[in-house]
């Protein structure tokens, strides 16, 4: 059992060392993306100190030959400038950079002001709902009964009113289908 733990620990140490070695060998990013332009355009910037820079998209050259611009305008971000971009000089080339824009037409940018506005609106709506329920529910319990609200249906507080004899009204017959004698 101890030998298995030691082997697992050795495997963990080796994998961590390989990760740090790969990170040290990694080149710095030579192509940078700038999408904070006022007109919504996306710019790629290549950090080469060379005279001629060639821009590639998906392995095909997109810049004119012998171009000297270290920046490349991809156009508006709404036009979806997707692809694998790379800049190449006379002596070296950059790593591939994948540009992928996912546009959302019905999205809301959630910053601190938007979230606090939602919370404030929710608190205000709950307050008005609670006040409305309080005033509607509180009206019935506070009202006192008045003498004019009470109607006297039967005289002298009788429980039942006797039926009058020989009247053919709706409630004068109590025995169903039998007809009363006249």
From Swiss-Prot:
Residues 37-94 form the Ig-like domain. It holds the Pfam family Ig_4. Disulfide bonds join 46-87. Glycans are attached at residue 66. Phosphorylated on Tyr residues after T-cell receptor triggering by LCK in association with CD4/CD8. Phosphorylated also by PKC; leading to the TCR complex down-regulation. One of its GO terms (biological process) is cell surface receptor signaling pathway. GO terms for molecular function: identical protein binding; transmembrane signaling receptor activity. Keywords: Adaptive immunity, Cell membrane, Disulfide bond, Glycoprotein, Immunity, Immunoglobulin domain, Membrane, Phosphoprotein, Receptor, Signal, Transmembrane, Transmembrane helix. Residues 149-177 form the ITAM domain. Residues 138-182 are cytoplasmic. It comes from the Eukaryota. GO terms for cellular component: alpha-beta T cell receptor complex; external side of plasma membrane. It is found in: Cell membrane. The TCR-CD3 complex is composed of a CD3D/CD3E and a CD3G/CD3E heterodimers that preferentially associate with TCRalpha and TCRbeta, respectively, to form TCRalpha/CD3E/CD3G and TCRbeta/CD3G/CD3E trimers. In turn, the hexamer interacts with CD3Z homodimer to form the TCR-CD3 complex. Alternatively, TCRalpha and TCRbeta can be replaced by TCRgamma and TCRdelta. Part of the TCR-CD3 complex present on T-lymphocyte cell surface that plays an essential role in adaptive immune response. When antigen presenting cells (APCs) activate T-cell receptor (TCR), TCR-mediated signals are transmitted across the cell membrane by the CD3 chains CD3D, CD3E, CD3G and CD3Z. All CD3 chains contain immunoreceptor tyrosine-based activation motifs (ITAMs) in their cytoplasmic domain. Upon TCR engagement, these motifs become phosphorylated by Src family protein tyrosine kinases LCK and FYN, resulting in the activation of downstream signaling pathways. A di-leucine motif and a tyrosine-based motif are individually sufficient to induce both endocytosis and delivery to lysosomes. This is T-cell surface glycoprotein CD3 gamma chain. The gene is Cd3g.
């Amino acid at each position: 059992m101890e030998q298995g733990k030691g082997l697992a620990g050795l495997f963990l140490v080796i994998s961590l060392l390989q990760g740090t070695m790969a990170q040290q060998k990694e080149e710095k990013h030579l192509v940078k993306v700038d999408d904070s332009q006022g007109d919504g355009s996306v710019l790629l910037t290549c950090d080469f100190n060379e005279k001629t820079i060639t821009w590639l998209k998906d392995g095909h050259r997109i810049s004119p030959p012998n171009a000297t611009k270290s920046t490349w305008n991809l156009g508006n971000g709404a036009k979806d400038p997707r692809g694998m971009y790379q800049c190449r000089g006379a002596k070296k080339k950059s790593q591939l950079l994948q540009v992928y824009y996912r546009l959302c037409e019905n999205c809301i940018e959630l910053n601190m002001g938007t979230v606090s506005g939602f919370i404030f609106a929710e608190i205000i709506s709950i307050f008005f709902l609670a006040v409305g329920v309080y005033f509607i529910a509180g009206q019935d319990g506070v009202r006192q009964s008045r003498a004019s609200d009470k109607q006297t249906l039967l005289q002298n507080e009788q429980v039942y009113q006797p039926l009058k004899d020989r009247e053919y009204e709706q409630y004068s017959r109590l025995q169903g289908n039998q007809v009363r004698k006249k």
